[in-house]
Amino acid sequence: MNVYGSLAGPVQSRAQVFRPAPEVLYERVESSDSCLALLARLAKMATTQGNVPILHLECHGNEDGLQFADESFVSWLDMKPHLIQLNIATRMNLLVVVSACEGSSIAATLGPVDRAPLHGLIGPTRVVLPSDLEAGYLALYETLLRTRSARDAVQAMIAKVPETFVYRAAEWMFQHVWDHYQRTHETPEARLARGIRMARNPPAGYDGVAIDAEVFADLLRQKNREFFDRFRRHFFLCDLYPEHEERFTVRYDNAEV
């Protein structure tokens, strides 16, 4: 299956009508090592030349990652740090388009200590026929080149092949991670369980009186907003690019907490 190979020609020809014409490059990558090397090369190019690529990955895939022509496999977890570096190099403007079954599954690898691996992700949510991938993504790129609107392009793709593709913005991924953390670590029961562990194993260097588990649990509750703000600034690269404080308006008061 080589869907993007068949898309490269039509997309290149359509791109040539614009001035300046966006550069469309097609590179065949046959192994997981070559894929990770390509991501590192793109990050270097973005850093030195200021390029902001749309990265289109096409291969076999499942919920765990991507498989290449030589049958090597790279998990989404192993790919994540390479995408993070590329996203940092593009100042958090990286759009990743995945032509692989379950191509939107990278969101499941994110945790509350991660930076955003991309600005936006487009991928299928089910096993997809090559013909559906080609039709959907051709509609995406045709509309993107014509309108310069990512929103219109995604809508055209979904209209062409319904109930197949999703668009996940970085804000959605942040909320996905935060919601999971709240469900698993910040319920009253979860906080108490953490408090019990903290009471049994107090912080290194603490030699005061024993502290009840309930006190630790209440402290965790009080620190929830502080943790949210640390995660938000780290995820959206606000420490690297202070302007992202205004660019990404997710706040504790308007997030689902």
Regions found by a protein language model. Give the residues of each.
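Low-complexity, flexible helical/coil segments
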Residues: E23-S32, A89-L95, P130-L138, V154-P162
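Hydrophobic residues in alpha-helical segments
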Residues: A46, L144-L145
